[in-house]
């Protein structure tokens, strides 16, 4: 397996797109071949590398150019307050990144907020997307079975508003099914990321007031998506309800759904080996 590190793959690029002028986006890049852009979730301290370091090596070895993008207002990318729903604004930033790097088309892999970003990109820029891979994406409105917002989202906003090590631990306990994966190394790494950028936390809450989660819902437009789509979900997800996966399956013309048992909101991390195998097979053969 290719040995990669965060520092050896770390890069910056300035993007110019609606709402972004000479805006610094940080990303990690490795490999050659068709481009796969991986989009992280929206929890405090999230970033491309921390979300996908268990996936980048196998995808590079499979012959792909992999880009792990820090979304605007996260990790090492510039700070921002958003006046529109975050999935749409983030999708514009993905286009800006692709334009700056001369990438005509890319496959998108999106988890949670990153899934909402990928959905919006597929809707706004259908000629620029290859295949679409979603893991528990946000932006799909109410649930048939679960009260909204779910337990994990409530903890996420609590952590944004009152960041503490204990609240972070509580959120990760809801985030992951397998509690043995919540190591001191994982907790400390995420806590350090949260403390590094206090402005990002404040701006996220301001943005959420301007464009709350209810504005993210793109369910009515899912039928417009023409990209081949692979949906994955954790059966035990306590952030985004499993029935949202059925919404996607019912409404996207060319879609398939895989549900991982004993899995929370981070399928690509909790079940990395199986996730990598399934998605690489989808990219190669679907």
From Swiss-Prot:
Reactions catalysed: 2,6-dioxo-6-phenylhexa-3-enoate + H2O = 2-oxopent-4-enoate + benzoate + H(+)
Pathway it works in: Xenobiotic degradation; biphenyl degradation; 2-hydroxy-2,4-pentadienoate and benzoate from biphenyl: step 4/4
Site features described as Transition state stabilizer, chain residue numbers: 112
A GO cellular component entry from the record: membrane
UniProt KW keywords: Aromatic hydrocarbons catabolism, Hydrolase
Protein activity control: Inhibited by 3-Cl HOPDA.
GO terms (BP aspect): acylglycerol catabolic process; biphenyl catabolic process
Amino acids binding substrate: 42-43, 51, 111, 180, 190, 266
GO-annotated molecular function: 2,6-dioxo-6-phenylhexa-3-enoate hydrolase activity; 2-hydroxy-6-oxonona-2,4-dienedioate hydrolase activity; monoacylglycerol lipase activity
Domain of life, per lineage: Bacteria
Assigned EC number: 3.7.1.8
A UniProt-annotated Pfam family: Abhydrolase_1
TM annotation in the entry: none
EC class: hydrolase
UniProt-annotated catalytic positions: 265
NCBIfam families per UniProt: biphenyl_bphD
Family note: Belongs to the AB hydrolase superfamily. BphD family.
Subunit structure: Homodimer.
Function in brief: Catalyzes an unusual C-C bond hydrolysis of 2-hydroxy-6-oxo-6-phenylhexa-2,4-dienoic acid (HOPDA) to produce benzoic acid and 2-hydroxy-2,4-pentadienoic acid (HPD).
PANTHER family: MONOACYLGLYCEROL LIPASE, MONOACYLGLYCEROL LIPASE ABHD6
UniProt protein name: 2-hydroxy-6-oxo-6-phenylhexa-2,4-dienoate hydrolase
Organism name: Paraburkholderia xenovorans (strain LB400)
Species classification: Bacteria, Pseudomonadati, Pseudomonadota, Betaproteobacteria, Burkholderiales
């Amino acid at each position: 397996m290719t040995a990669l590190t965060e520092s050896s793959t770390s890069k910056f690029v300035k993007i110019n797109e609606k709402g972004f002028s000479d805006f610094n986006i940080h990303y990690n890049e490795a490999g050659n071949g068709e481009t796969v852009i991986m989009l992280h979730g929206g929890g405090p301290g999230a970033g491309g590398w921390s979300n996908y370091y268990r996936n980048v090596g196998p995808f590079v070895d499979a012959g792909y150019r992999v880009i792990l993008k820090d979304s605007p207002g996260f990790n090492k990318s510039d700070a921002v307050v958003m006046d529109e729903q975050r999935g749409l604004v983030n999708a514009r930033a993905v286009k800006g990144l692709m334009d700056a790097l001369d990438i005509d088309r890319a496959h998108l892999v999106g988890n949670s907020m990153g899934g909402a970003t990928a959905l919006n990109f597929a809707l706004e820029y259908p000629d620029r997307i290859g295949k679409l891979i979603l893991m528990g994406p946000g932006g799909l409105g109410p649930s048939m079975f679960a009260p909204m917002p779910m337990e994990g989202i409530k903890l996420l906003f609590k952590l944004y508003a009152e960041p503490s090590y204990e609240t972070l631990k509580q959120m990760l306990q809801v985030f992951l099914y397998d509690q043995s994966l919540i190591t001191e190394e994982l907790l400390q790494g995420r806590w350090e990321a949260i403390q590094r950028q206090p402005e990002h936390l404040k701006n996220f809450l301001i943005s959420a007031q301007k464009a709350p989660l209810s504005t993210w819902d793109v369910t009515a437009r899912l039928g417009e998506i023409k990209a081949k789509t692979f949906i994955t979900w954790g059966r035990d997800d306590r952030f985004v309800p499993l029935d949202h996966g059925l919404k996607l399956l019912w409404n996207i013309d060319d879609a398939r759904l895989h549900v991982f048992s004993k899995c929370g909101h981070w399928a690509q991390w909790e079940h990395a080996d199986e996730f990598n195998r399934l998605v690489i097979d989808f990219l190669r053969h679907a």
